[in-house]
């Protein structure tokens, strides 16, 4: 779904327990070069508990936003670039979360691998052809990153 130049995608992620579903809503807004921002809003059902911390619910200690902004994408996105890497979107991950620091451990276990899979499978075509869709090094030019329909 596209709203105000942002591509919005909701992904349900089943966990080991059948009644547990984590929903990630991805709001994607892209600019060329270093002026780029992607915000992921994470919401969960309150019944989910950590395997090693059954008394703490993820609803209470959930990560609320992940913001990807600036720096180089090449370390995260293994695609053979045919142009200078500065012509492509550059992202770094910043995390805003509620609760103690072990939320980042849960994030590393469940969410970051999902992002990596999305970036390496769904964004290849978009990134490989980005220079055909927008002017090079134009920080104020918006371009939407789209997912495949079967994501």
Curated annotation (Swiss-Prot):
It holds the Pfam family DUF468. Belongs to the UPF0320 family. Contained within a telomeric X element core sequence. This is Putative UPF0320 protein YFL063W. It comes from Saccharomyces cerevisiae (strain ATCC 204508 / S288c).
């Amino acid at each position: 779904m596209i709203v105000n130049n942002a591509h919005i995608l909701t992904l349900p992620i089943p966990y080991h327990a059948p009644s547990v579903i984590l929903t990630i809503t991805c709001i994607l807004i892209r600019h060329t070069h270093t002026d780029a921002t992607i915000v992921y809003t994470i919401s969960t059902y309150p019944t989910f508990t950590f395997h090693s911390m059954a008394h703490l619910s993820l609803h209470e200690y959930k990560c609320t936003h992940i913001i990807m902004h600036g720096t180089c994408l090449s370390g995260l996105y293994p695609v053979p670039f045919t142009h200078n890497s500065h012509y492509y979107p550059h992202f770094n991950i910043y995390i805003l979360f509620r609760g103690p620091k072990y939320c980042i451990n849960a994030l590393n276990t469940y969410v970051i691998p999902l992002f990596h899979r999305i970036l390496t499978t769904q964004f290849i075509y978009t990134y490989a052809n980005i220079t055909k869709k927008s002017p090079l090094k134009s920080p104020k030019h918006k371009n939407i990153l789209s997912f495949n329909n079967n994501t």
